[in-house]
Amino acid sequence: MYPHHGAAKIVEIADRPFRGQVEPHLRLEVAITQLQIWIPVSKIGADEGQVPVRKVIDDEQLKEVKKCLREEFVEEPTNWSRRYKANNEKLDSGEVMKVAQVVRDLWRRDQDKGLSAGEKRMLAKARQVLESEWALARGITEEAAAGEVEKVLSTKKD
C-alpha cells in the first residue's frame, strides 16, 4: 500500500542513482491507474520524511476496518480548514484505520449536511485508497469492493 495512491504491486527491484549514490529502489505499479512509482529502499519506513509503504491488510484487520466504518459519526472540528487538515494528515499516514475514519466521517457528513467540493474530492480519494486495498485483501474487483464498502457504511453499528 502506498499513501494517497492505494494498492500497488512491487514489479521490479533495481539499483538506481539517488542523491549521488546508487541505491536499490522498488518500482511500484498502482493497481487503479498503472502509475509507476520508484522509491529508494532507504526511504521506506514510518519516520518523518519516509514513505510508509506496507503490506495489504489481512482478514482480521479487514474486520476492524468494517467495525470502524460502522461506528457512529465522530464529531470533528466545525472549522472547515481544520477538519480538512486533520483528514489530510490521516490520509498522509497511509494507515488503513485512519483512511477508514476519513471515509466514515466524510461519508456521514455528506449524508447529513453535504460536503464542500474539496471534501468531496477528499472522500473520493480516500474511498479509492480504501477500496483498492479492500479489493486486494478480499481477492475481488474494485467495483465489488466499492459496493461492499457502501453496504458497510450504510449498516448501523452492531
What are the residue ranges of the model-derived segments?
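Charge/polar-rich, low-complexity and marginally structured segments
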Residues: I44-D158
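A positional/architectural concept
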Residues: M1-Q50
